Structures are given as C-alpha cells and as structure tokens.
Amino acid sequence: MRIKRYAVAAVTAAVLGTVTLATGISSLAATGWVQNGNNYMYYDNDGSLYKGWIQTDDGYYYMDLSTGIMCTGIKKINNALYFFDTDGLMLTGLIHDVSTDKYYYAQSDGTLVIGWLNLDGSYYHMENDGSLG
C-alpha cells in the first residue's frame, strides 16, 4: 500500500508540474513589438505574427506581408510609394533622407508624390522614385 501511495503522489506531482510548466511556457509567448537582430516584428495578443498596417498613437507602421518585418525607408505598397523613418514610422510632408541627401514629399495619406507637386504655389518635379528632380 505504501508503495502505491508514493507512486500515485509522484505521478500526481509530475502531472501537476507538467500543467504548470505548460501554462508558464504559454504565458511567455511574444506579444507587441519584438526585436530580432536588426529587425522588429509585432505579435498580436494571441502570439501570431502581425502583417500589414499598424496604427498606434504615434502614427502608422507597415509590417511586410511576407516576412512580418517592420518596414523602413521607401516601400512600395499597392502600387504606391511610402517613406518610413528608421523607427518604422510612416512620414508625411517634406522629408529629407540624410543617408542619400534626397528630398521627398508625402501626402497626408503617406503616399509619395510622383510627377508635379504644387506646394504653396511653387511647382516641383518629383521623380518616379518619389525624390525631388
């Protein structure tokens, strides 16, 4: 009888330990912004990798549809160009890219102007890459 009680206690402890361990592991699932090397990704509350547009109090971010990696620099999305800063925030208005010393202009929806831009009565030609010609 004594051996059976110890065996039952050991099995019960092992089962409870497994349940506790499994619960502990599931609570460690990544949520929110997660850095992986030089890249950032965003995980939903259920732990799934988010892809597409994210709106925060700061503005808009775009997570690549194939990789889920936060976009920076110029990105073509649905045949329109957008400019994201080094923190991934979509920019609007006049943009100076210090790494290339080029200027861009993004409308209020974030799309870069291509072709002629009328800014306060002055006209500027924006190239096909969105940069000032």
Regions found by a protein language model. Give the residues of each.
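Extracellular adhesion/carbohydrate-binding repeat motifs centered on closely spaced tryptophans
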Residues: 2-133
